[in-house]
């Protein structure tokens, strides 16, 4: 059920991140080298999740692994326990909550019309449903943290925190962001571009689907204009 995926990606994963923030306040600060393995593990996990995204053929699995990779960055920056790091983690969790939920919603919109989640069988929707293509483009741009969205603010704060803590982490961060951009572009091109494989008539999008997407992306755009609300 798509509602379960949306709630899991938007709320439950982020509650886990919030729990880690609360738990870290009871632990000693990272002046010792005790937390280095956890930070490296979180960043390496983010890269592996991103690489897994690149080889996915199932649209829903791709979006799910995308959520995992973003949480890797969040966990890495929470462990460092700096004000900028916590602000960046909160910003990215809230922004990615909206984005991943919107992507799951769009995947379901495609699934209802094609009855498949295989990427190669969901091509050519820009010819059939141009408004949905616009929503896909916006959601993917937010997923790759395009300025001036809240995703960009969060990732910038996370990058600054990790770079100040250890400059070599920029290699892993940069690689992670590069792969994120690659699979987001791959997801957009696979679902929207190319010839349509459908021979049957496709049902047009309904107002409720556009309303659902508006309620995901417009609050995120508004929060992006005033990020002090969340950080």
Swiss-Prot record:
Topology class, membrane: Multi-pass membrane protein
Keyword list, A-Z: Electron transport, Membrane, Mitochondrion, NAD, Respiratory chain, Translocase, Transmembrane, Transmembrane helix, Transport, Ubiquinone
Pfam families per UniProt: Proton_antipo_M
Record-annotated membrane-spanning stretches: 1-21, 34-54, 63-85, 89-111, 128-148, 169-189
Catalytic activity: a ubiquinone + NADH + 5 H(+)(in) = a ubiquinol + NAD(+) + 4 H(+)(out)
Listed GO CC annotations: mitochondrial membrane
Protein's UniProt keywords contain rRNA processing: no
Superkingdom of origin: Eukaryota
A single BP term in Gene Ontology: electron transport coupled proton transport
EC identifiers of the protein: 7.1.1.2
Subcellular location: Mitochondrion membrane
Protein name according to UniProt: NADH-ubiquinone oxidoreductase chain 4
Species of the source: Lachesis muta muta (Bushmaster)
């Amino acid at each position: 059920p798509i509602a379960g995926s949306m709630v899991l990606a938007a709320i439950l994963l982020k509650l886990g991140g919030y729990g880690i923030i609360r738990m870290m306040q009871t632990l000693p600060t990272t002046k010792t080298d005790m937390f280095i393995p956890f930070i490296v593990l979180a960043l390496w996990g983010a890269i592996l999740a991103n690489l897994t995204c690149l080889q996915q053929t199932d649209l829903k699995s791709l979006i799910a692994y995308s959520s995992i990779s973003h949480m890797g960055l969040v966990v890495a920056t929470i462990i460092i326990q700096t004000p900028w790091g916590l602000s960046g983690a909160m910003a990215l969790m809230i922004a990615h909550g909206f984005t991943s939920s919107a992507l799951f919603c769009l995947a379901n919109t495609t699934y209802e019309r094609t009855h498949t989640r295989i990427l190669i069988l969901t091509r050519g929707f820009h010819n059939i449903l141009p408004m949905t293509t616009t929503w896909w483009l916006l959601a993917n741009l937010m997923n790759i943290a395009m300025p001036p969205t809240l995703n960009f603010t969060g990732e910038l704060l996370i990058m600054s925190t990790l770079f100040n803590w250890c400059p070599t982490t920029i290699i892993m961060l940069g690689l992670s962001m590069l792969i994120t951009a690659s699979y987001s572009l791959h997801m957009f091109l696979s679902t929207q571009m190319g010839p349509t494989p459908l021979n049957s008539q496709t049902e047009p999008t309904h107002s409720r689907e556009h309303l659902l997407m508006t309620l995901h992306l417009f609050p995120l755009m508004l929060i992006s204009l005033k990020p002090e609300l969340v950080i």
